[in-house]
Structure formats: C-alpha cells, structure tokens
Amino acid sequence: MKRFLNHRLLYVLLSSLIACTIQAIKLEDSPFSFGQKYRGEKFLIAGCGWDKVAVIDKRTCRFEWVHTIGKGEDCNDVEVTREQNILYAYTAGARLITPGQHVVWDYKVGGNEELFTATQLFDGGYLLAICGHPARIVELDNNGRTIKEIHFETGIETVHNQFRQIEKTRRNTYLIPLFGSGELIEMNVSG
C-alpha cells in the first residue's frame, strides 16, 4: 500500500506542474551522489508556477536535490548538460549552475522579452531563444559568451504567445513552434 501511495504522490506532483519539464538523468559519471542502485530512476523536474528545479527519486518519491528559483522566475526548460551541470530557462533569462548550486553564468533578457528555451548544442555551446519584438535566437559558447545572435519577427503580437523550446538541427536550421499561429517553421542561420 505504501508503495502505491508513493507512486500516487509522484503522479500527483508531476501532473500538478503546468508546462512541466522532466528529464531522466543518466547516472554514469554523474556528480549527483545517488549511487548506481537505481540506475536511470531519477528525474530532473521543473515547471511553470513552481519555485524549484529538483531531482526526484522515482522509487522513493523523495527529493534528492533541490534548487529554489527566484520569485516570478517560472522555469519552462531544464536539462542536465554533458558536463553534468543544470541548465534552465526562466522567464527573464537562463542560468547554468553546478550540482553544488554555484552559478556558472546567468543570461538576462530585457523587460519586454521572455526566455523559454535553454539547451546545450551538439558542439557544447548553448542555444537560448527569446520571445520579443524582434524575437532572438542566441548561441553562447561553453563559457556563456554570445557567439551568434539572430533577430526575426514571428508575426505574433503578444510576446508570451510566440514560442517555446526551439531546437537547432544538425543541418544548422532552427525548428520554431509558433504558439499564436499553430505553425512549426524552420529557419536557417541567416534568419
């Protein structure tokens, strides 16, 4: 019965996170001291309206690691990087932190912009996508310095309704899901 309740608790917690991002963590070479006993049974979670980024043990439903984000910093994208750091997007920026909670870099956006995409690229750099007028795709090097910035218009007036989770393909194009129009567009690096 207790096991059922733990799984029920995990289900309720995960389903209550609106726009929740969940990533199963690969534990090989992980700095998280969760051991190899439950290989692949940890989840990195975050969600809009929740003030944390956390690692949860699937079996016990216990928090193994928690990072509290600031008031109003809704997290919409989170991942463990190849270097085993935590990268997450929050409405006013993106942040890369170590498992020890040290901030490696913190990229902030302007007052009329919102950032909902932060992901590590194939080459080890980072991709950030910023809703605004104009919207921007920003690529950072592995130290968090801007190396490329592309400006474009989405045709969607309300900044919050523009897009989420942009992806860069191996063909050097960007896939952009436009919320306001229901379209998926592909854009090259020239914009």
Go through the PLM ranges and name each one.
Residues M1-K2, G144:
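Accessible peptide chain termini
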Residues K2-Y11:
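Bacterial N-terminal signal peptides that target proteins for export
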Residues I25-G191:
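Secretory-pathway ectodomains
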